[in-house]
Regions:
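Conserved G/P- and acidic residue-centered "switch" motifs that form tight phosphate/ATP-binding loops
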Residues: 38
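His/Asp/Glu-rich metal-coordinating catalytic cores
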Residues: 2-10, 15-18, 24-29, 33, ...
Length: 142
């Protein structure tokens, strides 16, 4: 089964992009709307009009970017909708507030892992296995 577009999420200008929602994932340049997997500097950029993340990531982002940023927060597992796409954050076990991001559209599930860690860590929520049809995985070390 294919989505209404050939690919719901694609690589564009150095970042992941969902055209249907007009949203970037961990962008490397300022954009209108950015989903952020976690608050490490290689996963967000300064100057986005709006950030969307977990509550914990938002706290860390404000420390790094400044309190004046526009940011929407969601709990793990809490679905929100943008242009008919259901989006939710799920624990990735990497750092405090880190998340995988799931997109559901046209009965297909897409998952972006962001950085993740399978080993238990007392400083963050443990990695959650999320059912998906398409997996886009972070690959820092090759």
């Amino acid at each position: 089964m294919r989505t209404k577009q050939e690919y719901l999420i694609r690589y564009k200008d150095g970042s992941l992009y969902c055209e249907l929602a007009n949203i970037w994932i961990d962008p490397i340049k300022p954009v209108k709307r950015a989903l952020i997997t976690h608050a490490h500097f290689d996963h967000f950029t300064f100057g986005c009009e709006e950030y969307i993340s977990t509550r914990e990531t938002a706290i860390l982002l404000k420390k790094r970017v400044g309190d004046n940023i526009k940011i929407k927060t969601f709990d793990y597992g809490q679905e929100f909708k943008i242009n008919g796409i259901n989006i939710s954050f799920h624990p990735s076990g990497h750092i405090l507030g880190s998340s995988q991001i799931r997109f559901i559209f046209a009965e297909e599930k897409w998952l972006i892992t962001g950085d993740f860690k399978l080993q238990k860590d007392e400083t963050c929520k443990q990695y959650e296995i999320v059912k998906t049809d398409y997996l886009i995985s972070e690959c820092t070390f090759g």
